Amino acid sequence: MDDKLIFRLKEFYALETFQVAFYEAQISTSTDEYYCKAFEKMVQIESGHADFFAQVLEKAQIELPTFTGSLFDLAGDFVGEMVGSTGRHNTCKLGIALENKAMQAYRTFITESKNKHYSELRDTLMEYLLDEEFHMLWLRDYMTHHN
């Protein structure tokens, strides 16, 4: 496993872990049952993504990136409170920005993995890209129809 692949795997582990923290924070700041259910589903999916990247790194005996627990929790809490105080519309805007960042990163990684002939990894990356696109579309739709 080359250094660039290791860097990408760690980058995606961190990105997916951050998305999980962000979406979990939204669940705890809302009373809208449908909204919470959607974020619970996103947490489930993004956790699966993070677990996948963790497993690939662990299988290669590469140390996982570590996050200072309280600092990472604080970031999730801060983002949740900040967005909660500005409303669901802005929560969705921030979520869309996160999903767009993830989609851009996935597209780059998919291209890089094609060049390296990592076909099994590419298939998984494409599945995860679709998940990110679906999340972004849900957030956009919710933002449009639920002021």
Predicted regions and their residues:
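Non-heme di-metal
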Residues: 1-147
